[in-house]
């Protein structure tokens, strides 16, 4: 159904103005997080930028926000710390509240420790799960508790809250050599869907982005940026992702909750949930093991052996 003025929800607006809003962006010293922080600031948001201390020390993101977004009244505050530590998540929330309140969270921080599964160490597994999944959880939980408490005193029990969590197509596909990364990203998607269902009643919108972006973390995957003609943009430029994040963080996204988006160049793909391929029903009240074995064996004997739950078709589009 096409939205018109007569059927548009009262919560729906076209505005992406973030003046007066406070956002937290993790992994914001460089790459995608830096671009997202700048993008939100250009819309008027005050941004709490987070990264590890060494990355922030080498970053110009705070100065860049000050220079690029001064006309919008935005500013940036840096909070150094490991996002996998609860103390960092607590400090990020406290900083946002000190600036007027937490409105937007963009969880972006991440690392890779690629290795074939049979060679992967405990440390390589734990490090990736800690930064990606635990890091997302800690700040998401803090934001959820803050918004829920705030909603108790709000008119109509609703507040403005936007949660944008960064997953990956790896979590839908399961790439060889990235068992840790894929597991963490799949977990982030599930975490966000749970948050969306829990927080939607309070007016909070929680969504997932799966970006294809050329950053330092993905350099080994995507390589160096190509030469582009004047006026053109690299298909893997983080700026493509920023446009979607600006929307999802804004009042205009009030009706968007619990969704998964893939961003690649000028294309934004909305991903549908898994569908049922086939249901196998017993003739009686339960399956006889021999009959179930024969039924499943015969079905898979005529099926493409390369077809699995892995969403490989998404990678080809």
Swiss-Prot record:
Active site: 168, 181, 185
InterPro entries: NAD(P)-bd_dom_sf, Peroxisomal_Beta-Oxidation, Sc_DH/Rdtase_CS, SDR_fam
SUPFAM superfamilies attached to this UniProt entry: NAD(P)-binding Rossmann-fold domains (SSF51735)
GO BP of this protein: cholesterol catabolic process; fatty acid beta-oxidation
A molecular-function term among this protein's GO annotations: 3-hydroxyacyl-CoA dehydrogenase activity
Pfam families assigned to the protein according to its UniProt record, in alphabetical order: adh_short
Phenotype on disruption: Cells lacking this gene are shown to be highly attenuated in a mouse tuberculosis model. Required for growth on cholesterol.
UniProt KW keywords: Cholesterol metabolism, Lipid metabolism, NAD, Oxidoreductase, Steroid metabolism, Sterol metabolism
SMART domains: PKS_KR
EC number: 1.1.1.-
Pathway: Steroid metabolism; cholesterol degradation
Residues annotated as binding NAD(+): 32, 51, 82-83, 108, 168, 181, 185, 215
Family designation: Belongs to the short-chain dehydrogenases/reductases (SDR) family.
SUBUNIT field: Homodimer, with 1 active site on each face.
This protein's domain notes: The protein surface forms a large groove around the active sites which is larger than homologs, probably to accommodate bulky sterol substrates.
Record's function text: A reversible dehydrogenase involved in cholesterol side-chain degradation. Catalyzes the oxidation of hydroxyl-cholesterol-CoA ester metabolic intermediate (22S)-HOCO-CoA (3-oxo-chol-4-ene-(22S)-hydroxy-24-oyl-CoA), the product of ChsH3, has no activity on (22R)-HOCO-CoA (the product of EchA19). Also acts on (3R)-hydroxyoctanoyl-CoA and 17-beta-hydroxyandrost-4-en-3-one, but not on 7-alpha-hydroxyandrost-4-en-3-one, uses NAD(+) but not NADP(+).
PANTHER family associated with the record: DEHYDROGENASES, SHORT CHAIN (PTHR45024), SCP2 DOMAIN-CONTAINING PROTEIN (PTHR45024:SF2)
Protein name: Hydroxyacyl-CoA dehydrogenase ChsB1
Gene name in the database record: chsB1
């Amino acid at each position: 159904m096409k939205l018109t003025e007569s059927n548009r929800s009262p919560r729906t607006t076209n505005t992406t103005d973030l003046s007066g809003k406070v956002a937290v962006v993790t992994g914001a010293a460089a790459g995608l997080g830096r671009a997202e922080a700048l993008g939100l600031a250009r819309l008027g948001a005050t941004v709490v930028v987070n990264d590890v201390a060494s990355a922030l020390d080498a970053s110009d993101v705070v100065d860049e926000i000050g220079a690029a977004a001064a006309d919008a009244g935005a500013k940036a505050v840096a909070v150094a710390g490991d996002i996998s530590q609860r103390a960092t998540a607590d400090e990020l929330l406290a900083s946002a509240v000190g600036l007027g309140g937490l409105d937007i969270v963009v969880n972006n921080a991440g690392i890779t420790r690629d290795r074939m599964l049979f060679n992967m160490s405990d440390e390589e597994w734990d490090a990736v799960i800690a930064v990606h999944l635990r890091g997302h959880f800690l700040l998401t939980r803090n934001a959820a508790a803050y918004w829920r408490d705030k909603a108790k005193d709000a008119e109509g029990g609703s507040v403005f809250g936007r949660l944008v969590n960064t997953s990956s197509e790896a979590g839908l596909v399961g790439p060889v050599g990235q068992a840790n990364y894929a597991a963490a990203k799949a977990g982030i998607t599930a975490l966000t869907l749970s948050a969306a269902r829990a927080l939607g009643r309070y007016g909070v919108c929680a969504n997932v982005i799966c970006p294809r972006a050329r950053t330092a973390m993905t350099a080994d995957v995507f390589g160096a940026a190509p030469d582009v003609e004047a006026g053109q943009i690299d298909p893997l430029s983080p700026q493509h992702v920023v446009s979607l994040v600006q929307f999802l963080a804004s009042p205009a996204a009030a009706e968007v909750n619990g969704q998964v988006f893939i961003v690649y160049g000028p294309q934004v793909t909305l991903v549908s949930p898994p569908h049922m391929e086939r249901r196998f029903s017993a003739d009686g009240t339960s399956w006889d093991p021999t009959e179930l074995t024969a039924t499943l064996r015969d079905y898979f004997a005529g099926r493409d052996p390369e077809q699995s739950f892995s969403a490989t078709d998404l990678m080809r589009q």
